[in-house]
A protein has these predicted regions:
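Proline-aspartate-enriched helix->loop->beta-strand connector
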Residues: 160, 164-174
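A short helix->loop->beta-strand "cap" motif at the edges of active sites that frequently abuts
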Residues: 37, 108-109, 189-193
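Short, flexible loop segments at boundaries between secondary-structure elements
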Residues: 142-148, 190-228
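Conserved beta-alpha
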Residues: 76-159, 163-164
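N-terminal nucleotide/polyanion-binding subdomain common to many enzyme families
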Residues: 1-94
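Short glycine-rich anion-binding loops that position phosphate/pyrophosphate groups of nucleotides
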Residues: 45-48, 172-177, 200-201
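A transmembrane-helix-recognition feature enriched in membrane-embedded lipid enzymes
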Residues: 76-78, 210-261
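Short Gly/Thr/Asp-enriched flexible loops that form oxyanion-binding sites at enzyme active sites
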Residues: 125-127, 178-187
């Protein structure tokens, strides 16, 4: 069983940027399409600028995603400057705010939450219960520290097969969660909704800095993160500046890999 039926409306043609096919439609359309199951990713500016060229498994995960959201406001701006075309921005946070209001999320056992630490597991469990979601400790999995390259986590895959959730939420960070989601989609034997939205959940629960809807809407969530923890996020987002050169140099084409391992 999946989280809902697929939309019968014709899907808009994807917009290819740097070899990745982004979903160009409105957020409601993305949500309805995602409800049919599959892998949803929302690459950040730093992810596109760095991981896309340095981690082949990350690139493959994005290339094979069922839906890729236009989460990066910087990428959307660059694309408009390069092509003159308006690419509608759909952030992972805006997606999650709407998704959490779907009836499926109120069903016991419907979601499995994959968390980066025991502390975040406990915090998220408390928040979900406070919001009226039927979350239980058994609905969580604390991920180990994953390495580079293709990922495998048979313990997690077995848990998904056993519990058969409609939704698997991966909150373990960009660059890693996409590779894990790619593995899970092909390993579990059915088609749950796999949401690789990482920190979007932490923005809602308070585990990370709160990002108000208006801040997200104007594309300044990155600035809020930097201001909340400059030492942690300044270097990360500085990497995204390379995205400008990549978009203007390669356009729709995939940039060459700089894989060095």
């Amino acid at each position: 069983m999946t989280a809902g039926a697929k939309s019968t409306a014709a899907s808009p043609l994807p917009e290819r940027v740097l070899g990745i096919d982004f979903f160009p439609g409105k957020l409601d359309d993305a949500i309805e399409r995602a409800a049919g199951g599959g892998l949803l990713t929302a690459p950040s500016g730093p992810g596109l600028a760095y991981d896309l060229v340095r981690e082949p498994a990350y690139r493959r995960a994005l290339e094979s995603s069922d839906i890729v959201l236009t989460d990066s406001s910087f990428m959307v701006l660059l694309w408009r400057l390069r092509t003159g075309r308006h690419l509608h921005r759909n952030s992972g946070l805006a997606f999650l705010r709407i998704w959490m209001n779907r009836d499926i999320m109120r069903r016991p056992g419907a979601a499995l939450w994959v968390m980066p630490s025991e502390a975040e597991r406990a915090h998220t469990l408390e928040w979900l219960r406070a919001q009226g979601f039927p979350a239980e400790p058994e609905s969580f999995y604390v991920a180990p520290a994953y390495g580079d390259g293709e990922l495998r986590d048979e313990r997690l895959a077995a848990l998904v097969r056993e519990r058969h959730p409609d939704v698997v939420y991966l909150a373990i960070g960009g660059g890693v969660q996409e590779r894990l989601g790619h593995y899970l989609r092909d390993a579990v034997g059915y088609r749950p909704v796999i949401l690789c939205l990482g920190a979007a959940l932490a923005f809602m629960t308070g585990a990370q800095v709160h990002i108000a809807p208006w801040v997200d809407r104007i594309g300044l969530g990155w600035l809020w993160r930097i201001l909340s923890n400059p030492s942690r996020y300044s270097v990360r987002y500085a990497r995204a500046t390379r995205l400008a050169w990549m978009v203007f140099r390669y356009g729709i084409e995939a940039p060459p890999s700089r894989y060095t391992r």
